[in-house]
A protein has these predicted regions:
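Classical Sec-dependent N-terminal signal peptides that target proteins to the secretory pathway
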Residues: 1-24
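Generic short beta-strand segments
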Residues: 32-38, 81, 106-111
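N-terminal helix-cap/turn-to-beta initiation motif at the start of protein domains
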Residues: 22-30, 124
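A short, structured loop/turn motif at beta-sheet edges
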Residues: 25, 100-101, 128-131
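Short, solvent-exposed loop/hinge segments that bridge or flank secondary-structure elements
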Residues: 28-62, 86-98
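Mid-chain, structured segments of secreted extracytoplasmic proteins
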Residues: 72-104
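Short, surface-exposed loop motifs enriched in S/T, G, D/E and P with embedded aromatic residues
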Residues: 64-74, 80, 127
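Edge beta-strand at a domain terminus
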Residues: 111-131
């Protein structure tokens, strides 16, 4: 009886370990950059970005510099926010939104200078999930 209880306990511990490994997996996306210009959307030449969504750390790492964004896991989208600075003097505020179904992404960049937005830009990304 005791040996059966020990075996069941080991199975329980192993199943918990493997289930946490399955849910802590990162989602890595390879994205083509679409620029927004005066005439509409244009594909950038040979520009790609990598988006790494770490569900366990609640962080999205974006771009070649792997800038960490705070992750909000919404029902239909992953939303990442990055803010550095003080809006009264100088600050950078970025918002990254990734659609869970289509993996379409958009990045809104705001630069605050003397309590006003001095630069406001948008970028769009067509992403493919990496295996």
């Amino acid at each position: 009886m005791r040996q059966a209880a020990v075996i069941l306990f080991k199975i329980l511990i192993l199943s918990i370990f493997f289930s946490t490994q399955a849910f802590s997996k990162n989602i890595i996306l390879d994205c083509d950059v679409t620029l927004v210009g005066i005439e509409g959307k244009d594909m950038a030449s040979d520009d790609t970005e990598v988006i790494d969504i770490n569900l366990k750390a609640k962080t999205i790492f974006f771009g070649a510099e792997a800038i960490p964004y705070n992750l909000r896991n919404r029902i239909n989208v992953y939303e990442g926010r990055y803010f550095k600075g003080n809006k009264r003097t100088f600050a950078i505020e970025n918002k990254l939104v990734i659609d869970k179904k289509t993996l379409q992404s958009s990045l809104n960049k705001n630069v605050w200078d003397n309590k006003a937005i001095s630069v406001n830009s948008y970028s769009y990304f067509d992403c493919i999930k990496r295996n």
